[in-house]
Structure formats: C-alpha cells, structure tokens
Amino acid sequence: MKIITQNKKAHFEYFIEQKFVAGIKLQGSEVKSIRAGKCSINEAYITFRNGEVFILNMHIAKFDASSIFNHEETRTRKLLLNRSEIDKLMGAQTRDGMTIIPLTVELHEGLIKVVIALAKGKKLFDKRETIKERDIKREQQQSLKGKMR
C-alpha cells in the first residue's frame, strides 16, 4: 500500500481504538488528482446518512488537464464498507461517545482506499503525556546514536 496522504494530527488528538479500510466513490478527475498527491484529509470527518457512510470536507484539488467536467473540491463522498462494519461503527459512535476519523488515503492494487478509525478524543493532560513520551523516545534515540559513533 502506498500512502498518498495522512492525517498527522489524528494520533496526537485521539486514542485510536480500531481501524477499518474503506473504498471511496470518486469521479475520474478526482482519481487522477489523488494519484498526483493533491488531496488533504486534515479537516475531514465521517458521518452517517440513511445507513450509509460519507466523508465530508475531504479536499481534492481540481485536476489541471481536466475540461469543464471537473469536480467540486470538498464535496461529500460515499465510503464503501460492509454492512457489518457500518453497524459496528454506528453502534460504537452512538453508545461509547467515540468519533470516526480518516487516518490515511492509500493506493492499494490500483484502487484508492481510505483508512478510517474508531477513536476517542484525548484530554489536555493526555496530549502532554504524549509529548513527554515522544521527547523521551527522541532523547533515547539520540543517546544510542551518540554511543554508536
């Protein structure tokens, strides 16, 4: 799987509970633009309508070589999941106070997939703890690197 774009703040702002790989319904110019790496999911979120899953605010830049049939950049796009996965996501979101966020957009065997996650928001002290752990890990790596020289 080739990662095209990722939501870098997701791991900092949320505890990731479970991941799902979903297909996405796109137009031709959107596929070409995503393959060129011109998409962003930093402000995207997942919602449900009539038992179906949709991603909102996913920004896909207009494809330059496309004619008048170009797509709208932040339109609502349908995600393709199995019924059991949709039921699991809907149940967890309503019951446990969890949210569903997009993590990455990937190219898998010629198909574009969106990895979404069932996540729980972090509090401020959790974020501080994450920063401390990251700093400690970085210092350990630097000290090991210094000893190897």
From Swiss-Prot:
Source organism, top-level taxon: Bacteria
GO molecular function, one term: RNA binding
Protein keywords: Cytoplasm, RNA-binding
PANTHER family: SSRA-BINDING PROTEIN, TMRNA-BINDING COMPONENT OF TRANS-TRANSLATION TAGGING COMPLEX
Known role: Required for rescue of stalled ribosomes mediated by trans-translation. Binds to transfer-messenger RNA (tmRNA), required for stable association of tmRNA with ribosomes. tmRNA and SmpB together mimic tRNA shape, replacing the anticodon stem-loop with SmpB. tmRNA is encoded by the ssrA gene; the 2 termini fold to resemble tRNA(Ala) and it encodes a 'tag peptide', a short internal open reading frame. During trans-translation Ala-aminoacylated tmRNA acts like a tRNA, entering the A-site of stalled ribosomes, displacing the stalled mRNA.
HAMAP family linked: SmpB (MF_00023)
Protein's name in the database: SsrA-binding protein
Lineage per the UniProt record: Bacteria, Bacillati, Mycoplasmatota, Mollicutes, Acholeplasmatales
Gene, per the UniProt record: smpB
